[in-house]
Swiss-Prot record:
Catalyzes the facilitated diffusion of 2-acyl-glycero-3-phosphoethanolamine (2-acyl-GPE) into the cell. PANTHER family: MACROLIDE-EFFLUX PROTEIN, MAJOR FACILITATOR SUPERFAMILY (MFS) PROFILE DOMAIN-CONTAINING PROTEIN. The chain crosses the membrane at residues 18-38, 53-73, 91-111, 139-159, 163-183, 223-243, 253-273, 286-306, 310-330, 350-370, 372-392. Keywords: Cell inner membrane, Cell membrane, Lipid transport, Membrane, Transmembrane, Transmembrane helix, Transport. HAMAP family: MFS_LplT (MF_01585). One of its GO terms (cellular component) is plasma membrane. This is Lysophospholipid transporter LplT. InterPro entries: LysoPLipid__transptr_LplT (IPR023727), MFS (IPR011701), MFS_trans_sf (IPR036259). It is found in: Cell inner membrane. GO terms for molecular function: lysophospholipid:sodium symporter activity. Belongs to the major facilitator superfamily. LplT (TC 2.A.1.42) family. It is a multi-pass membrane protein.
Amino acid sequence: MSQQTEPATPLLSRSMSAVIIAQFFSAFGDNALLFATLALIKQLVYPDWSQPFLQMGFVAAYIVLAPFVGQIADSFAKGRVMMFANTLKLAGALLICVGGNPFLGYTLVGIGAAAYSPAKYGILGEITRGDQLVKANGLMEASTIAAILTGSVAGGVLADWNIYAALSICAVAYGVALGANMLIPHLNAARPGQPWHPVQMASSFFSACRVLWRDGDARLSLIGTSMFWGAGVTLRFLLVLWVPHALGITDNATPTLLNAMVAVGIVLGAGGAARLVTLDNVRRCLPAGFLIGVVVVIFTLQHNLLSAYSLLILLGALGGFFIVPLNALLQERGKASVGAGNAIAVQNLGENGAMLLMLGLYSLVVKLGVSVIAIGIGFGVLFALAIALLWASLILTKRRARSAGAK
């Protein structure tokens, strides 16, 4: 008796296409708005030390809301959660456009982004099947990086022309993302009916943290992704000091273009991971993580712009190959235990905590007068050693499990 198999759903289904379009314009708005708002506060003669507070408010929203946004993503249809989050982003952009406090407006965008993140990743596990999840993550990361590239450039260029035109374009981008969210078919909530008491939600969140930490695969993903994004933000600031020191170039464009090369590489690496890595062999990404640290050391010693561009593309490619499978792994493990939304919320807490920690350490060594070359070498060596230790611990754990099974 022959069995009929259900035809496979294409990767770029209506739902997936809507999610990717919404993600691109939402991330485009986030990045363009940052640079447009920086230009605005300069025009309004805010002190220079106030500029980092834009990003701090944005990141702080992720950390403060981490215990709650995962449950929000799992308690409602994720497409509707994404729509609500983009509405908050649109409100923040409009607040800045009409002359409201830019720090308050961008923090409101951060609140929207914090609510958006668990839903945008969690929905991938609901609209794809099996190994399509890794490919879907590759599309999501590629869309995000493309938005970072185009949004950052657009925000800066448009702000030089007209700041309020730049801010208006950001609001339009959020509006387009909101429209794309409306095209996502209604999906059932993953975990409806959970209690809405802040203390219980916080307790549930930290319980999810413990559950994921005890899961070896989830722990690998949490550590790896937190290290990657913490290092990525630190590298962005490192480049600003490295360019004039190593290349003798003092303009503002060169560090931006070098950062863009990393983003281009991440897109390439994400595509490679989608083709070569599955959930069954996800640890294949670890050598790429180790090589990130090695390439940072080699890059720091360069004095040629062309070699710098080439190495940063390679660095980004290694990063994309490293991060995409780890994201997919956490979604899979989280979906099976605490819910994909809660898993991504825990991941956001780890990543943003790592960003604050690494930037704090970076600021400290700069203040102590350590040279940028020494910082770059030390940064690369420490990152490579950390990944090597993580890799070694996984190998030892696997060997112990085999030994126990043999007995």
